[in-house]
Amino acid sequence: LRVGDAVALRFDEVINGEIDIEEQKTGKRKSLTLPAPVMQMIARRRAEFPHDVHVFRSQRNRSMNKQAPVRREEVSKQIAEAAKAIGIHGTVSAHSFRKAGGNAIYKRSANNIALAMTVLNHSNITDTRRYLDIDKQAVSRVINEMDL
């Protein structure tokens, strides 16, 4: 999920461990089965904040009695601050997790680009190759394996 879709998630969109949403960026439908740890987190949040509409409502919105999710910009800001605090330098944002997740799926599936493309909800393979830097990875791997 893109961070904007994740923070906009409402409790009523989580049904039997699955979500079916319309992506904000593309307008395409996306269905996902949520892992057990995510479902446990959602259940804890629901129990702690039974009147919230959104799974990720900020403390500020809650104190102002505003039914709105946390802003994606705030999530990226918090991630960047956390990365800096543990010594990770450079650009780190919520989007970094989407790219890392896509790369992890690609590598764990024996380089199944079609699976990565499906998970990322890309319309064409060219976008997925560019997104995952596959050409760059392949060239680097071949060069490193050369016996010069």
Region locations from a protein language model:
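Conserved tyrosine-mediated DNA breakage-rejoining catalytic core shared by Y-recombinases
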Residues: 1-40
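Active-site-proximal segment of tyrosine recombinases
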Residues: 5-7, 92, 102, 110-121
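Mobile genetic element proteins and their domesticated derivatives, centered on retroelements
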Residues: 21, 56, 79, 128-131
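Catalytic-site neighborhood detector that most strongly recognizes the C-terminal catalytic loop/helix
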Residues: 23-27, 120-145
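Basic, alpha-helical nucleic-acid-contacting "clamp/cap" segments
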Residues: 24-65
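N-terminal core-binding DNA-recognition domain of tyrosine site-specific recombinases/integrases
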Residues: 31, 65-74, 91-93
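Short basic/aromatic active-site micro-motif
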Residues: 89-105
